[in-house]
Swiss-Prot record:
This is Low affinity immunoglobulin gamma Fc region receptor III-A. Residues 239-254 have a biased composition (Basic and acidic residues). PANTHER family: IMMUNOGLOBULIN FC RECEPTOR, LOW AFFINITY IMMUNOGLOBULIN GAMMA FC REGION RECEPTOR III-A-RELATED. Forms a heterooligomeric complex with ITAM-containing signaling subunits, either a homodimer of CD247, a homodimer of FCER1G or a heterodimer of CD247 and FCER1G, to form a functional receptor complex. Interacts (via transmembrane domain) with signaling subunits; this interaction is a prerequisite for receptor complex expression on the cell surface and intracellular signal transduction. Binds the Fc region of antigen-complexed IgG with a preference for IgG1 and IgG3 isotypes. Interacts with CD2; this interaction is involved in NK cell activation and cytotoxicity. It comes from Papio anubis (Olive baboon). The gene is FCGR3A.
């Protein structure tokens, strides 16, 4: 059902001679950016897509079922577990968006991040979120069971440039009043750039710079040879054309 285009969009497509696959795809954004939230949190989903002058409505889908909302923003005032699932949107001049996942959890604490898979040197932003934003203090972020960062008052934890050593299981804990509470554990994965990885596997770290320099020098020499040969070809051709041959009979043919 959600795969059907808006009736108005169909008319516009026919009149303009366009096909559905020619339209841009709509995009769903979360505000705030966290796709894992606690019950009672407020969540706003925004749809970015093209609209026709005649139809500025938006179609929202939750787990492939049409939602009654027709505005560009879909607001959840107090999230519940049954709000979890995939959300998509579509406008009159855009195709159905890719799904965005929303997870609603029950608990005192939740470790949040925009995503759980990062590349080397990406920045990582972690947030230890308490239910209904209850005051939280003496907060510790832990990696693989060991304390990674401590804050007397609750604060977000930033890793400016991720390395492979930052991969692992993470959770946070702290005090709400005198009650010691912890979040569920989540796994963070840091991936290595394939190009860097392939060079590193061939050469030890001490030789990688030398290898790059050799490649640059080989390229420079190869380029110089190319232009040198290219420059000499026209003159050689010209000399060949200007050269005159004289034929003489062999003495015995006389």
């Amino acid at each position: 059902m959600w795969q059907l285009l808006l009736p108005t969009a169909l008319l516009l497509l026919v009149s303009a001679g366009m096909r559905a696959e020619d339209l841009p795809k709509a995009v769903v954004f979360l505000e705030p950016q966290w796709y894992r939230v606690l019950e009672k949190d407020s969540v706003t989903l925004k749809c970015q897509g093209a609209y026709s002058p005649e139809d500025n409505s938006t179609r929202w889908f939750h787990n492939e079922s049409l939602i009654s909302s027709q505005t560009s923003s879909y607001f959840i005032a107090a999230a519940r577990v049954n709000n979890s699932g995939e959300y998509r949107c579509q406008t009159s001049l855009s195709t159905l968006s890719d799904p965005v996942q929303l997870e609603v959890h029950i608990g005192w604490l939740l470790l949040q991040a925009p995503r759980w898979v990062f590349k080397e040197e990406d920045s990582i932003h972690l947030r230890c979120h308490s239910w209904k934003n209850t005051l939280l203090h003496k907060v510790t972020y832990l990696q693989n069971g060991k304390g990674r960062k401590y804050f007397h008052q609750n604060s977000d934890f930033y890793i400016p440039k991720a390395t492979l050593k930052d991969s692992g299981s993470y959770f946070c804990r702290g005090l709400i009043g005198s009650k010691n509470v912890s979040s569920e554990t989540v796994n963070i994965t840091i991936t290595q750039d394939l190009a860097v990885s392939s060079i590193s596997s061939f050469f030890p770290p001490g030789y990688q710079v030398s290898f790059c320099l050799v490649m640059v020098l080989l390229f420079a020499v190869d380029t110089g040879l190319y232009f040198s040969v290219k420059k000499s070809i026209p003159s050689s051709t010209s000399d060949w054309k200007d050269h005159k041959f004289k034929w003489s009979k062999d003495p015995q043919d006389k």
